[in-house]
């Protein structure tokens, strides 16, 4: 069990303390439920965000198939993309954001932590990534996808890099040095691009 005082100071207490009102423990219990819901919807959001660009790759490749095949495949892929975006990705993004803001409202102490401020910067980048992905999504539904399959394979890894950064920041907090963090992200980006290149070479 955690106390509210311990939560606000970034500490975890293993038992009830004298003089701490029961209401504060109840608040912390709610905080843990809110945190769990936040994590659940972040996971489902990224699941959608990972698969949307993959469907875009398939749509680009389907356009190069014979007309009889593309006329069947493309509408089905567009339907899958629309359902994934409207039923899973967007609702998960909204709920994940609501529960995340709720956590900060309960525990504003987090805003004084440097790791949280850096994490919020990556969340801002994620919002920009989401907006751009939405524009690609609308273009594909209108039959105007003008990028290559390789571009969307690379674009697909943008969410991966942001996810790695957010998870490491939330887990290691202030114990991670920003230089090592940047080196880790650049190394991951290099490995992802190398994997895409090797995959393309293998397919050819």
Would you name each region that the model predicts?
Residues 9, 19-204:
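Polytopic transmembrane helical bundles with strong interfacial aromatic enrichment
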Residues 4-13:
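Short, often N-terminal, low-complexity regions
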